[in-house]
C-alpha cells in the first residue's frame, strides 16, 4: 500500500480537472422573467379581428397564447403604433388600439393581466397560473398630437413608454427615418416642446424610448431626461449600418444613463448582407405596395392590412434569411460595448417581414438563451438580458417619477 500510494497520487495529479458543467439553458430560460418590449400585435387585434387565443401559422403571425407559453414570455409591451401614412386622426387611432389590447386581456383573463408597474409584472408571474403581464408603449410621438394632456391621458390608460418618433419626423422631434429627406422640415433634434415632452414623461413615470429617433434627437433626449431611457427595439450600427441602429457612442451613452437597449430581431437590422439586399429592392417593393394601396382603396381595413402584410412578406422572402447567429452577435456586441446591464430583447414581432433562421415566432425565444449560454453567458447574465435589465430601468423611472411628483404640481387639471 505504501509503495503504490505515490503512483496513485501521480495519476490523480495528471488527470484533467473536472469541467465546469455548462449551464442548463432551458432551465435558465424557464426560470427567467422574460420581457419583450415591442410587438405590433395590436394591429392584428384591430384590423384583422385576430384573437390572441387562436393558434395561427407563423406565416400569419408571430404571437398567440400557445406560442407565448412555449416561449415562456412573461411580459409584453404591445405597440400602440399609428401609421401616419394611413391615418390622420392619430390620437383616435391610438385609443382604438389601446381598447383592443384591453379587450384581448379581458377575453383571456385566465392567462393575461394588465400591468401598470414593475410590481405588477412581478405579481402577474406569481402562482401556478403565471399570467402574461400586458403593457403598452406608444410608438411615435405624433400620436399625442402636440398635446401634453393627451400624453397624460395615454399614461392614465396604461401606456408606460413612448417612442419619441416613428420613422416620420413630427412637429417636435427628428426621426432617423427621414433625416436625409430635404423635403422634410427638421428641427435639429428636439424642439423646446419636445424637451417638455421628455420632462413630462419623466414626471409621469413613462419611459422615454429613443428607438427610431435621429442621432441628434437621441443626444438631446439624454441631455434632458432625469430618468434612464430605453431603446425599445434597436440594434447595433457597428454590425449593421442602418440609421435605425445605435452607434457604439450611443450605446455607451445609454450605459452612462443607466438605460437599456432592447435588441430588434428584424433581419435588415441585424445582418448587413440582408440590409443591403433589402434596400436594393426598396424602389420596386414600394411601387408594388403603392399599386396595392390604389387597388384596395375602397376595401375594408382588415383586407388592406392582410394584403399589405402578405405582399411585404413575399418581397422579404426573396432574400435569404440571415442565421440566428446574426441576432446573437448584436446582443453580444451591445453587452460588451455598453455592458451586460444595458441590453435586452425588443423583438418587433408582428411588425417585421423577416426574422433570422430558426426564430419563427415568440415560441422560439428559448433558442436565444441556448445560443447565449453556448457563448459562456451565466445564469445571472442571462436573467438580466431576458428581462432583469428592463425591469431595473422601469423601477428607476418609477422612483424618479415619485421624486418629481413630490416636488412639482400635478398637471392633471390643465
Could you say what each language-model-derived stretch is?
Residues 196-210, 216-220, 250-256, 333:
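Substrate-binding cleft of carbohydrate-active enzyme catalytic domains
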Residues 186-193, 209-214, 246:
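Short, contiguous, pocket-lining structural segments
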Residues 170-179, 189-190, 214-224:
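Active-site-adjacent beta->alpha loops and helix N-cap segments on the catalytic face
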Amino acid at each position: 500500500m505504501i509503495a503504490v500510494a505515490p503512483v496513485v497520487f501521480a495519476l490523480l495529479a495528471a488527470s484533467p480537472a473536472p469541467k465546469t458543467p455548462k449551464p442548463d439553458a432551458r432551465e435558465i430560460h424557464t426560470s427567467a422573467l422574460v420581457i419583450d418590449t415591442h410587438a405590433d400585435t395590436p394591429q392584428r387585434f384591430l384590423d384583422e379581428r385576430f384573437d390572441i387565443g387562436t393558434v395561427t401559422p407563423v406565416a400569419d403571425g408571430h404571437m398567440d397564447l400557445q406560442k407565448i407559453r412555449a416561449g415562456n414570455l412573461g411580459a409584453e409591451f404591445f405597440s400602440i403604433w399609428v401609421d401616419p401614412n394611413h391615418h390622420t386622426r392619430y390620437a383616435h387611432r391610438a385609443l382604438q388600439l389601446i381598447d383592443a389590447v384591453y379587450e384581448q386581456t379581458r377575453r383571456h383573463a385566465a392567462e393575461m393581466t394588465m400591468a401598470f408597474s414593475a410590481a405588477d409584472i412581478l405579481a402577474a408571474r406569481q402562482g401556478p397560473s403565471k399570467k402574461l403581464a400586458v403593457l403598452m408603449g406608444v410608438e411615435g410621438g405624433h400620436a399625442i398630437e402636440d398635446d401634453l394632456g393627451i400624453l397624460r391621458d395615454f399614461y392614465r390608460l396604461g401606456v408606460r413608454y413612448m417612442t419619441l418618433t416613428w420613422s416620420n419626423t413630427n412637429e417636435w422631434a427628428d426621426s432617423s427615418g427621414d433625416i436625409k429627406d430635404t423635403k422634410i422640415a427638421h428641427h435639429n433634434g428636439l424642439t423646446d416642446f419636445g424637451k417638455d415632452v421628455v420632462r413630462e414623461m419623466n414626471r409621469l413615470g413613462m419611459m422615454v424610448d429613443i428607438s427610431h429617433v435621429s442621432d441628434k434627437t437621441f443626444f438631446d433626449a439624454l441631455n434632458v431626461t432625469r430618468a434612464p431611457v430605453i431603446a425599445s427595439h434597436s440594434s447595433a450600427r457597428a454590425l449593421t449600418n442602418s440609421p435605425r441602429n445605435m452607434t457604439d457612442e450611443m450605446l455607451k451613452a445609454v450605459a452612462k444613463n443607466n438605460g437599456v437597449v432592447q435588441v430588434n430581431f428584424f433581419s435588415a437590422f441585424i445582418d448587413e448582407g440582408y440590409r443591403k439586399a433589402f434596400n436594393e429592392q426598396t424602389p420596386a417593393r414600394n411601387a408594388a405596395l403603392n399599386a396595392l394601396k390604389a387597388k384596395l382603396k375602397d376595401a375594408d381595413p382588415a383586407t388592406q392590412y392582410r394584403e399589405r402584410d402578405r405582399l411585404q412578406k413575399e418581397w422579404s422572402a426573396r432574400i435569404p434569411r440571415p442565421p440566428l447567429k446574426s441576432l446573437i452577435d448584436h446582443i453580444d456586441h451591445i453587452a460588451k460595448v455598453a455592458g451586460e446591464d444595458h441590453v435586452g430583447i425588443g423583438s418587433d414581432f408582428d411588425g417585421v417581414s423577416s426574422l433570422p433562421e430558426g426564430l419563427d415566432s415568440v415560441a422560439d425565444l428559448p433558442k436565444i438563451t441556448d445560443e447565449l449560454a453556448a457563448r459562456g453567458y451565466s445564469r445571472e447574465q442571462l436573467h438580466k438580458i431576458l428581462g432583469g435589465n428592463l425591469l431595473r430601468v422601469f423601477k428607476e423611472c418609477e422612483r424618479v417619477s415619485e421624486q418629481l411628483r413630490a416636488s412639482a404640481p400635478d398637471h392633471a387639471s390643465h
